[in-house]
């Protein structure tokens, strides 16, 4: 789904991670929930958040982040809602 102020995406990962220099720096805020699997998100300030199915996180616009890892044993399914104010 996509409108001028909101975009919803389902993302499927299986053992992927962002490249070492691959920081996301988005114009939109992002709310993401893990529906299945596991993942670790890393932030430019050095903080890491481990996520399991049912966990969610809000990422403000321009908060540089990356996917450190996703589960290699099980498919990881994300539901991401990107939005602008």
Where are these regions (language model features)?
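A short glycine-rich, His/Asp/Glu-containing loop-to-beta-strand
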Residues: 1-23, 81
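A generic "binding-loop/recognition-motif" signal
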Residues: 4, 47, 63-64
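Conserved hydrophobic/aromatic beta-strand scaffold that supports enzyme active sites
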Residues: 8-10, 31, 56-58, 80-81
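Tight coil/turn sites that cap or link beta-strands
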Residues: 16, 53-54, 60-62
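A short beta-strand-loop-beta hairpin characteristic of the jelly-roll/cupin
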Residues: 24-26, 31-53
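Short loop/turn positions at the edges of beta-strands in beta-sheet-rich folds
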Residues: 35, 45, 61, 72-73
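Ligand-binding loop in jelly-roll beta-barrel domains
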Residues: 62-85
């Amino acid at each position: 789904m996509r409108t001028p102020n909101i975009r919803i995406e389902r993302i499927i990962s299986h053992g992927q991670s962002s490249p070492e220099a691959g920081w996301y720096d988005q114009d939109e805020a992002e709310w993401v929930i893990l529906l299945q699997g596991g993942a670790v998100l890393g932030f430019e300030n050095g903080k890491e958040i481990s996520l399991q199915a049912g966990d969610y996180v809000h990422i403000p616009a321009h908060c540089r982040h990356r996917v450190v890892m996703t589960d290699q044993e099980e498919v990881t399914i994300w539901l991401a809602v990107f939005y602008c104010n």
